[in-house]
Structures are given as C-alpha cells and as structure tokens.
C-alpha cells in the first residue's frame, strides 16, 4: 500500500515526514537537510530552482527569487496586508486575473498556489527518493487561523503538485499529535506556534489517544519574516544616517540586508551580541561603502518588542474561549523557529506562569504530526481521535449589512448548522446569499468567501417565504453552503471558493505546467549528467592522445580527434540534448579503444624489455586504470 506523507508547508521552511513503524520519521532532502527553504527562483536561462539552490543565488537574483509566498496565499490584491508586503519584498506582487495577489518572476505571473506547488513537488520528490516508490497522497498543514480561502488555495497547491490532499490539518494540532501520541494521562496543553510568517495559539485537551481542540486564535501575518524586516529597516536607517544612502531602493542590497538580518536574529538566540558585516554593500562617487555594525540582543529585543507582545492578546482570547485560565494549562508546547528566541520564551513564561516545554524540535514537529495524521487516515496508527475546530465564525449578510452568525468560532468540526431566513421585500423572486467569515458585526468588515443566488421564489409578501440556509464544514475546515426554499423545494448550493480563487480550469492548466516543468527539470538534469560524463571522457582521452598518440595510426588518431570535436560541439551548443551527447560519448569511447589497446601493448612491451615479472606489472596497470576511472568519476560528480 502506497505511503501517505505528511508535509509542513511553511512560510520560511518546509519539511516532509512519513510513518516508519510506530514513529514519524523526518526525511532529509537531496542536499542532506531535514528542512527545505520555501523559496523558488527562476534564472535568466529559464531554469527553475527550489529550496536551498534558490536561496543560495537569492542575493544575485533578488527580483526573480520568490519567498514567503504563503503570506499571500488566498488573499485579494487589495488586502491591506498585501499592500504592506509589497514594500518589503524585492520581487513584484501583481494583481492576478481573478483579483488575487500573485507574484511575478522573469516577466511571468504566478499564483501563490503555483509557487507553493513547486515547493510541495520538491517535498514529494524528497519522500519518493527515500521510499523508492511513487507518492500520490499527502496530509498538508496550514496555520490554524487560516480562513476558508487560504485552506482552499493550499488544497489547490497540492493538486497542482500532483498530490491528492487527504486532509488539511492545523499546524498547532499537528504539533500536539506529535507531542502527545505517547501520553496516556489527561492533560490540558497550549501550543504556541510562532513560525516564519504566521502565529497560532491552540488550547487542547489530550489523553488516551483523544486530541480535542478547545479553542484556537492567531495572526496570519505575524512571524519571523516580520522580525527580519524590522531589523532590515533598522540597518538601512542606521546606514542612511551614517552614509546618506538609502539602501532600500537597491534590490540587491535589500536582499543582502535580509540575509544578514536573518543570520543575526538566529545568532542572537544563543549569544548576547553579533556583528553584521556587509562589505561593498553599495557605492557612490567617493567609492565603495561597507556596512559594519555590532548588534546586541537587548537592542534587537527592543526593536521587535511590539511584535512579541502582539502574540499576547490571541493567547488570552484562546484561553477565554476554551473556558480555562493560564493556571489550568499543564504544559505550553513551543513550535516554530521563532519560539527559540529568548524574549519569546520569557513572554510565554510570564503569560502562562510556567517554563514552556522545549522537548520537541520546533522545525520538525508539525511535519511529524502531519505524518501521524496520515497514518491515522491510512489505518496504520490506531486509537487516535482528532477533534479540531473552525477558527473563525461563519455566517451570511442579512438586512442592513449585518453579519448573522450560523457557526461560531471554535466549533468542533466537521459540523452542520441550518437556520431559516425570509425575504426583505414584497414579491421578491430571488435572494442573494453572501457568505462571510470573521468576528466583526458588519458583514463588509469580514472576509467575503463567496455568494450565490436562489431564484424562482413565488411572489409573496415580505417575511412569508421560508429560506433554509445550511452551512456544512468538513474535517479540512472547508465550507459548503446551501439555500432551500421550503415552499417550492428549490435548492441552490455552492462549495465555497474564494471570491477570487482558482477555477478548475486554472488548476488543470497549472497541473499541466507543473508536469511540463517536472519533465523539463528531469531533462535538464539528464543533460548535466551527460555533459559531466562527456567532459570527463574528453579530458582523459585528450591526455592519452597527447602522451600516446604516436602509438596509433594517423587514421585512428584522426578518428579520435574528430570524435572529440563532435562531442565538444554537442556539449557547447546553446540547447544541448542529453541523447545526442550520450551517443557521441559512446562513439568517442569506441574509437578511442584502439588507443587504449596501444597503450596496454606498449606498457607490456616495456615491462618485457625490463625483464621484470609480468604479473607484478599487470597489477600496476590495473591499478593505474582504476585510478584513472576513479579520477574521472570524481570530476563527473564535482
């Protein structure tokens, strides 16, 4: 039975895990790392880089290196948070055809779901390389505070990547699964998850295989990226004070600042002071300028104090919604890379009145929880019951633009709820059902998820028709809404798709693009491997011709030189073809066999002339040949 994998699709880093017996195992990627940067880059020659290779070239290619796109997923272009993000990233954020926020690289627009799909593809390939089999199904995590549009977009990303997403699971819930799988005694825990781009807090009751989420809260635009940018702004302001040059207008300098800020932030979690040193950051008429600055932990904490404090209100709201106090919490589990920051741990300790639990790896625990949930769905993990909640209230717009709730936040899912409404005018023959999600009293202040019309109502006085509106939320937190006229039996329903969102046709097109890209990546790799082998053979053959060319006939030597020239030409063409290179490599190997034979005979003759024991010289020849091949292989893999 094919394995179902668990993927933590993070803002900054992603991670993939699979059940190995009774334990969740985090899988290392092709670079040997357990987490993969959530970055995608497009080079000038059309190559697509994902993960660490994309991160390595970000400084030299800032406008085409896309990162933190999870913060844009499922968001409209006009969203104030998108507006804020535009000034902080070096790549263009554009308005998609459907009105959503998209990103642009090498002049082409991509939806955040498409970019996320490229990262998911990398995770899928990582798992396939480890398992030695195709992977087609996955459980993917999302921030608990993601709304319906963001969840749907994440599911779309999985589909584009060629994965059937069996379940969308909340990140804090996944972390609780990994933390509490072996715990038998009942506990009330809080999962404090401060990641690269989002913050979640969930209160759960766990024990004997039952994981019941009591409440969740958070901020989908608060995370490590904000801490980095706060430091970038400080460094740029200090540099401007000293040198009078605005670094934020220089995209290359901005990317270098961002990398330095992230590095300094990490170092300050374990040391009291760090030095930021960026030589040749910019230049003016007087010559090159360098940025050198010492930064203390206290200064950094002062810069980001308001960001850390922004996590407090959601924590208090979650405790209140769960009907517990901080004293009732038995354990606070820290999740997400930012939870390593001493200031964050200090605030958590003050808030909950106890030392937070640091026994889980904050970068890996979410993926492990996703793998456990995958195991539950597959039937490999027994006696685990997961009861999650919807993070935001759901309802419809009623007379006067009021938001009428049908399902309150923190309701256990899956769930279904109906309510009867009527018309506002006499002889009204159609009603528009506008579905929103949020906590504000007026519908316009909440997130509009979608709308649909129920038509063909018989003419009646206002207030007479009975229209039953039903909300149905599945285990992924994705909403379906139906409206039925009880008089005529007419019914209309929609599976809520973000008011922008991707249509099925969009997704199918992106699936085909993703498949074509995967094929192109495969071909590119085949070309690189063929070129490595060819260059290695050319090098060793040219060396042999130089040393022993006089041992073969002029015709044989010319055939070898022609084969070398043909192979070089095949490698150096603007669009190299792997099969062509392989065929010409084979030709060169065949024509150079006579040279090898001549070398062998020549060395045997020399051995005979010296009168030494031929067996001894044979060993030497074999060794020499072996060394040559080994040397070639070394060059091939370099």
From Swiss-Prot:
Residues 621-630 have a biased composition (Acidic residues). Keywords: ATP-binding, Chaperone, Nucleotide-binding, Phosphoprotein, Stress response. The keyword Nucleotide-binding applies. Residues 599-638 are annotated as: Disordered. The keyword Phosphoprotein applies. GO terms for molecular function: ATP binding; ATP-dependent protein folding chaperone; unfolded protein binding. The modification Phosphothreonine is found at residue 198. PROSITE patterns: HSP70_1, HSP70_2, HSP70_3. It holds the Pfam family HSP70. Belongs to the heat shock protein 70 family. Acts as a chaperone. This is Chaperone protein DnaK.
């Amino acid at each position: 039975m094919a394995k179902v994998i668990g993927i933590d699709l993070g803002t900054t880093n992603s991670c993939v895990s699979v059940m190995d017996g009774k334990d969740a195992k985090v899988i290392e990627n092709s670079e040997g790392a357990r987490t993969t940067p959530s970055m995608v880059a497009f080079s000038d020659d059309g190559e697509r880089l994902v993960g660490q290779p994309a991160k390595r070239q970000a400084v030299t290619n800032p406008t085409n290196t896309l990162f933190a796109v999870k913060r844009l997923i499922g968001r409209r272009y006009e969203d104030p948070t998108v507006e804020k993000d535009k000034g902080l990233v070096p790549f263009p954020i554009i308005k998609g055809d459907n009105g959503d926020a998209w990103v642009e690289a090498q002049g082409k627009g991509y939806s955040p779901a498409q970019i996320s799909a490229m990262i998911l593809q990398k995770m899928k390939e990582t798992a396939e390389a480890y398992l030695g089999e195709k992977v087609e199904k996955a459980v993917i995590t999302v921030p608990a505070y993601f709304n319906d549009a963001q969840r749907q977009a994440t599911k779309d990303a999985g589909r584009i990547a060629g994965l059937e997403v069996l379940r969308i699971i909340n990140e804090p819930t996944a972390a609780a699964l990994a933390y509490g799988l072996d715990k038998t005694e009942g506990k009330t825990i809080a999962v404090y998850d401060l990641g690269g781009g989002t913050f979640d807090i969930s209160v759960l009751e766990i024990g004997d295989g039952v994981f019941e989420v009591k409440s969740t809260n958070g901020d989908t635009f608060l995370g490590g990226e904000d801490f980095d940018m706060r430091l970038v702004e400080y460094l740029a302001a200090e540099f401007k004070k000293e040198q009078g040059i605005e670094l934020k207008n220089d995209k290359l300098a901005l990317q270098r600042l961002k990398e330095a800020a992230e590095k300094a932030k990490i170092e300050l979690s374990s040391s009291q002071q760090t030095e930021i040193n960026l030589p040749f950051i910019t230049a003016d008429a007087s010559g090159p300028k360098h940025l050198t600055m010492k930064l203390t932990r206290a200064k950094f904490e002062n810069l980001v104090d308001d960001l850390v404090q922004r996590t407090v209100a959601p924590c208090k709201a979650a405790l209140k919604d769960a009907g517990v106090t901080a004293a009732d919490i038995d354990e606070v589990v820290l999740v997400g890379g930012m939870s390593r920051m001493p200031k964050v741990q200090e605030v958590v300790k003050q808030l909950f009145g106890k030392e937070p639990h640091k026994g889980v790896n904050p970068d890996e625990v979410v993926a492990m929880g996703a793998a456990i949930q995958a195991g539950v769905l597959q039937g490999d993990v027994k006696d685990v019951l997961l009861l999650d909640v919807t993070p935001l209230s759901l309802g419809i717009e009623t007379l006067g633009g009021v938001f009428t709730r049908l399902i309150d936040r923190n309701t256990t899912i899956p769930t279904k709820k109906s309510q009867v409404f009527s018309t506002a005018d006499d002889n009204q023959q159609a009603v528009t059902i506008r579905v929103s999600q949020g906590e504000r009293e007026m519908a316009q202040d909440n997130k509009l998820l979608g709308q649909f019309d129920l038509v063909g109502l018989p003419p009646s006085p206002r207030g007479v028709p009975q229209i039953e509106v039903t909300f149905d939320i599945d285990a992924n937190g994705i909403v379906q809404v139906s409206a039925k006229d009880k008089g005529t039996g007419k019914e209309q329903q929609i599976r809520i798709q973000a008011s922008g969102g991707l249509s099925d046709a969009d997704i199918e097109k992106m699936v085909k693009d993703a498949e074509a890209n995967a094929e192109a990546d495969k071909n590119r790799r085949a070309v690189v491997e063929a070129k490595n082998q060819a260059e290695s053979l050319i090098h060793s053959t040219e060396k042999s011709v130089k040393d022993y060319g006089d041992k073969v006939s002029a015709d044989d030597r010319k055939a070898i030189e022609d084969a070398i020239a043909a192979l070089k030409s095949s490698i150096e063409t603007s669009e190299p073809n792997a099969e062509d290179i392989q065929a010409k490599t084979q030709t060169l190997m065949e024509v150079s066999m006579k040279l090898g034979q001549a070398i062998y005979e020549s060395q045997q003759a020399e051995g005979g002339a010296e009168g030494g024991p031929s067996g001894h010289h044979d060993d030497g020849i074999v060794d020499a040949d072996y060394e040559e091949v080994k040397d070639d292989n070394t060059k091939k893999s370099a």
